[in-house]
Amino acid sequence: MHDIHFLFVILWQINKNIMDIVQIKDKKFRISIPESVIKERVKAVAQRINHDMAGKNPLMLAVLNGSFIFAADLMREITIPCEISFVKLASYEGTTSTGKITEVIGINEDLQGRTIVIVEDIVDTGLTMQRMVETLGTRNPESIHICSLLVKPEKLKVELDIEYAAMNIPNDFIVGYGLDYDQQGRNLRDIYTVID
């Protein structure tokens, strides 16, 4: 009986290790942030927003496509009155930020006098976020706050006040939990780092 249990444990570990690596197109990725850690960090960020934004009815502006899962999970943890809308900006092709920022879907809400929280999946160079803050600033909001699931501090090219960062990560290319590699991998529950 002990041998069967031991064999089961070995097979489970082999299967787990196989599941830790995924292939997306021409690249392999390994789990770097498990779903349980992501959920904890999202909840912690939401609690800070609940505390800081109480009585302000913030407008959460989720940046598509990458932040849709983060935004949904974050909103489930927000307990204060708030609204949500979506904007789409692009600066990525494949695994590299192009620096070219194109507004695809605009903002229709009146932002004058509003408290705005930009909800982003990842702040990489910061160029996209800087452009977003500048664009929103022309609409006279009361304040603009940045909330990002992930931040790559060593890759930032501009100074940003990211008040609500769930996690700082190294300068690696990642997928999962809404982040993609050429539009694939967004559906993965964990976050994976490229290994080749």
Label each residue range with its predicted role.
Residues 2-196:
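PRPP-associated nucleotide enzymes
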